[in-house]
Amino acid sequence: RRQRQMCIRDSKKAKIPFGRLLLQTPSEPRTSIPDFRTLRNLPLETFSPNLEQTLAASESRLDWYTDFAEEEGVDGPSFLGWADTSNNPEAIADRTKEVLGLAAETFLQGPDKVKTLCGVLEDSGILVSRNSIVESTTTRPLSIDEFRGFTLIQASYALIFINTRDSKTAQLFSLSHELGHVVLGQPGISDHGESRDIERWCNRFAASFLAPASLVLSTVSPSDSPFDSVKTLSRKSGMSQEAALWRLVHLNIIDEGEASKLRPLVAPQPVQAMEPSSNKGGPARHRVVKARVGNRFFEAVTYATVAGKIPQREAAQLLGAATADSLSKLIAHSPSAEWRAS
């Protein structure tokens, strides 16, 4: 009995189900999502408990939303799976921007480009979740060394998850990269590496989506120094200086030799994102929850609750509300009565 208690204690500390500790051979993570992450060009084959639980929670949300949307007659994104890696990523990026209603001749607008793009993607029918921790557990941070984002696809619906432990510029690139996965109809866990064909394609797609070639050429002046060109493109596109540098190299505006000199100047600095809280001075609770589960999912659940389509207990579980009062407060901050999913 004492040994069993010790095993249970150890399983809780390791965030591993007790039954898995009893197996002679460690079990594989319970997910079928393709893993495109690499380390030194070799595939990664492990999932931390934090990543595994984040994947499981996201899969559950997409499962629920898929059933709900199909019953309500709500379509998924019209561009899901409309391309493959044989297509030119720049041409597909231009076409995707057009379908999303984004002007080809301008960069993403607004002081918070991540928020802007999240809104555009959710309006198109994609679920977008952002978090830097496992659900609401602040003692379990997500690691950007393990993953930057992932895309889940079920039937004609998709969910994008972004690790907000990353910098804002990296989050923006991740959103665009994961959009590439949606366009390809290819779910997966991403790290923006270059050793996999799909990841390379999605990187090119993201760079083209955020900084279309014609727009870059009209923005960067031939009289600018290479570093000034990098800073200008980074500021206007929302990409990191490193991503802007390689976009300019790809467009033959900066040569490889000059780029190698600039690399130390544009190398990303480690960022430790602070998890928003509903405490005094932080965002309100409903804003935190909306970011974690996504506006579209939040409004679908609250609409279904108010309309009597699902019980409050299920809604509370889907939104992570601990009490009926917490759920009521979340519902009060949703335009659920006027929600339009299409």
Per-region residue spans from a language model:
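Active-site hotspot residues in diverse enzymes, especially metal/ion-binding acidic/histidine motifs
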Residues: 1-342
